[in-house]
């Protein structure tokens, strides 16, 4: 985790950001031209990470406690929360270590710091890949639940979901290890960018198709009850707005980071690109914000999960609560295949 002044890095190998200034404003590039640089205070960054950490821990605990949530749909949501938890946790850990090194509180050998840096980079990269994969997996699961509703439980069985989850985690760890090892190859960065674009296209295609089917279904109900067409148009507008918010948040939170990686490949020395590189920490902050928003979109919309979450919060102040909960606190146990929240 080598430092240059106040610079901090998520994937230190992938970040070619020049030394950052301590205050927001206009920084000068090599020609003296003004360059907008937004500074994110470490306290704000750590606070957002802590909010994400607590939020996703609650999601994992709620799903683990309630056997009614032990279905493939909620397993994917649980793994998304776990990967988001690791994203925020690894960023908080790296920031804390950097602050301790800068303050001279943490003194250790350079080789130990470098090994720690590499370990955190692998953890961060693998958790980011997992987060993207599980967002795609949730979209696929919801697509199957709508277009193959009668065969959903025979297609999306629990063993298949568990194998898919295991494959995602293993592939993400192996891929991130290779990415960090061969960070100086442009192909590595391009693979990450292509992977992000593939997930974006997959989610867009599936959710747009689901929205179209929902509109057709609503139109059929309207015709059946001889209602007026404007009601159908209103439903379509609400669905389109929900879809825009869903994909818009995903793109706005993840897009700048992968834009950064793209520019590192194609214009590492260009003055305009260097101005963008100076805002690398802003891009990381947007990813942390996404880990805060994910539970609001995918988890907390479920009434069953919200009810269990209240029980978890009550149990935190009642020591014997989990023990008295009977079989509900066992993981994974037998499950009731519950399809979960409807698509947006």
Swiss-Prot record:
Stated membrane topology is: Multi-pass membrane protein
Q: Which InterPro entries match?
A: GPCR_Rhodpsn, GPCR_Rhodpsn_7TM, Melcrt_ACTH_rcpt, MSH_rcpt
Topology feature Cytoplasmic, residues: 64-72, 141-163, 212-240, 301-344
The entry's keywords: Cell membrane, G-protein coupled receptor, Glycoprotein, Lipoprotein, Membrane, Palmitate, Receptor, Transducer, Transmembrane, Transmembrane helix
Provide Extracellular-side residue ranges.
1-37, 94-118, 184-191, 267-279
From the Swiss-Prot or TrEMBL record, state where the protein is found.
Answer: Cell membrane
Q: Mainly localized where?
A: membrane
Keyword Membrane present in the record's keywords: the answer is: yes
**Where are lipid groups covalently attached, annotated S-palmitoyl cysteine?**
315
Tell me where the transmembrane regions lie. 38-63, 73-93, 119-140, 164-183, 192-211, 241-266, 280-300
Which SUPFAM superfamilies does the UniProt entry name for this protein? Family A G protein-coupled receptor-like (SSF81321)
Glycan-linked positions: 29
Q: What does the protein in this record do?
A: Receptor for MSH (alpha, beta and gamma) and ACTH. The activity of this receptor is mediated by G proteins which activate adenylate cyclase. Mediates melanogenesis, the production of eumelanin (black/brown) and phaeomelanin (red/yellow), via regulation of cAMP signaling in melanocytes.
Q: Which family does it belong to?
A: Belongs to the G-protein coupled receptor 1 family.
**What is the name of the protein in this document?**
Melanocyte-stimulating hormone receptor
Q: Which organism is it from?
A: Callithrix jacchus
Q: Which gene encodes it?
A: MC1R
């Amino acid at each position: 985790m080598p430092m240059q002044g106040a610079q901090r890095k998520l994937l230190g190998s992938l970040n070619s950001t020049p030394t950052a200034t301590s205050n927001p404003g206009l920084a000068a590039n090599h020609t003296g031209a003004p360059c907008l640089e937004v500074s994110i205070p470490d306290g704000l960054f750590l606070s957002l990470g802590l909010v994400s950490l607590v939020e996703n821990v609650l999601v994992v605990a709620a799903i683990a406690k309630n056997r009614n949530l032990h279905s493939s749909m909620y397993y994917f949501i649980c793994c998304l929360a776990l990967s988001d938890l690791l994203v925020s946790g690894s960023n908080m850990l790296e920031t804390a270590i950097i602050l301790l090194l800068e303050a001279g509180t943490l003194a250790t050998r350079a080789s130990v710091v470098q090994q720690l840096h590499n370990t955190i980079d692998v953890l961060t990269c693998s958790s980011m890949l997992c987060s993207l994969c599980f967002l795609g997996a949730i979209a696929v699961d919801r697509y199957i639940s709508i277009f193959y509703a009668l065969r959903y439980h025979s297609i999306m069985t629990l063993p298949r979901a568990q194998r898919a989850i295991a494959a995602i985690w293993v592939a993400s760890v192996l891929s991130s290890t290779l990415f960090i090892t061969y960070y100086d190859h442009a192909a590595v960065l391009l693979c990450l960018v292509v992977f992000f674009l593939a997930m974006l296209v997959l989610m867009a295609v599936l959710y747009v198709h689901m929205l179209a089917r929902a509109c057709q279904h609503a139109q059929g109900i309207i015709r059946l009850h001889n209602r007026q067409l404007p009601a159908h148009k209103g439903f379509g507008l609400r669905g389109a707005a929900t879809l825009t918010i869903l994909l818009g948040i995903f793109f706005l939170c993840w897009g700048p980071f992968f834009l950064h990686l793209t520019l590192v490949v194609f214009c590492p020395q260009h003055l305009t690109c260097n101005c963008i590189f100076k805002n690398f920490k802003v891009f990381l902050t947007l990813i942390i914000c996404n880990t805060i928003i994910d539970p609001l979109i995918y988890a907390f919309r479920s009434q069953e999960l919200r009810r269990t979450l209240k029980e978890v919060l009550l149990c935190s102040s009642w020591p014997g609560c989990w023990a008295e909960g009977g079989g509900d606190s066992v993981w994974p146990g037998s499950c009731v295949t519950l399809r979960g929240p409807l698509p947006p």
